[in-house]
Amino acid sequence: MMQICDTYNQKHSLFNAMNRFIGAVNNMDQTVMVPSLLRDVPLADPGLDNDVGVEVGGSGGCLEERTPPVPDSGSANGSFFAPSRDMYSHYVLLKSIRNDIEWGVLHQPPPPAGSEEGSAWKSKDILVDLGHLEGADAGEEDLEQQFHYHLRGLHTVLSKLTRKANILTNRYKQEIGFGNWGH
């Protein structure tokens, strides 16, 4: 009885969510033999064009909190997974997030102020700026509540990114004509 309960809890652990995401991205990486074929190919699958917005730093290693630019008519709320992005952009983002999980997030210097990227995205070191969590009046209950809130959010984002990696892999297989391979 105890083993069944432990197995259920392990299935929903953060470690397993990270492993599922890393496994999906590894599968995507092994399937996509020629990533350049993904350039300029729109990802028409609506399952990939929704609500996860993350920005990769200019050097490809740092996740940044962002102040989104004004969305144009072709974007879905200005998110990274907007329809205007091609499959290659999705591929690079998913691999970058996998590397951040496996190797850690390195703080990258912000892009130059005059650059296009610098005007659209406001860099902020989200790992170091924890001052708002360390308020003098914050009790232990608040920390526990914040921890559980962020843990649920991280688990949700990892699940969505895993699904997105699987969708991209299947879409690539359709594009090059071997949609039934590996099933």
From Swiss-Prot:
The modification N-acetylmethionine is found at M1. GO terms for biological process: lipid metabolic process; negative regulation of microtubule depolymerization; positive regulation of fatty acid biosynthetic process; positive regulation of ligase activity; protein polymerization; regulation of lipid biosynthetic process. Keywords: Acetylation, Cytoplasm, Cytoskeleton, Lipid biosynthesis, Lipid metabolism, Microtubule, Nucleus, Phosphoprotein. Belongs to the SPOT14 family. The keyword GTP-binding does not apply. The keyword Acetylation applies. The modification Phosphoserine is found at S75, S79. It is found in: Nucleus; Cytoplasm; Cytoplasm, Cytoskeleton. This is Mid1-interacting protein 1. One of its GO terms (molecular function) is enzyme activator activity. InterPro entries: Lipogen_MT_Stabilize_sf, Spot_14. Plays a role in the regulation of lipogenesis in liver. Up-regulates ACACA enzyme activity. Required for efficient lipid biosynthesis, including triacylglycerol, diacylglycerol and phospholipid. Involved in stabilization of microtubules. The gene is MID1IP1.
